C-alpha cells in the first residue's frame, strides 16, 4: 500500500551518506512506490548524479549551497505524475500556482552553477579539514564519541558527543568565543531535548546530552579549526572539573 518512500541523501545531523542507488533499486524491485530523496544537505557538498541515483524525485534548497533563502527545486523524473500542490494558476508546469520568485530562482541557478564548478576542489579541502579536526579532538579530548559514518560522511559535517558535559553549555561558551556550533539540527535549535537521531544510533545519558555538531564551509581555515579545538578543550576540561560524576568516574576507573 506504500505510495512514496522518502530517504535523506545525507543526514543533516550526523552527516552519514545513504546508499541511495541501492535503496532506490530495492524499493522499485519490490513495489510501485515513488522514490524521493531529500538532497538538501548533500547538494553542493558531494556529486549528485540523477541517472546513477535511480530516483523519481529529488529536492534541494538554495541556501545550503550559498544561494538565496526561501527557494529550492524539485527534480521530477519524466513519467512521474504529481498532482498540483495547490490550485490557481498554471505556473511551474501546473504544479505550483502563483507568480514565480524570479530573482530567487535566478540566484539559485547561479549558485548551483558556481558551486558545481568548484565542487570536487571544495569537497576535498573540507574533507581534509574535517578529518584533521576529528583527529585533534579524538587525540586531545578523552571520553568523546564520533557520531555517524567515519568514511561515508559529508565533507563539512562533524558530530561528536562528549561525556560529562552538556552540549548546550558547549554551544553557549563557544558562542562567547565567537565560534558558532549547534547541539543538534538547525531545525531544533534552542530545544533542550536529546536529538531523536542521536537516540536512534544508540547513544544515551551523559554522552547523548553532550552532543555538538560542527559544520565547515569552503571558507573555513586550518587556523579556525585549531582555534576551535583549543577553545573546546578548555571549555570541556573546566566543565568536567565541576562535575562530581566525572570525578567519581575517574576514581572508579583508576588502574
Predicted features along the sequence, with ranges:
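Pyridoxal 5′-phosphate
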Residues: 1-255
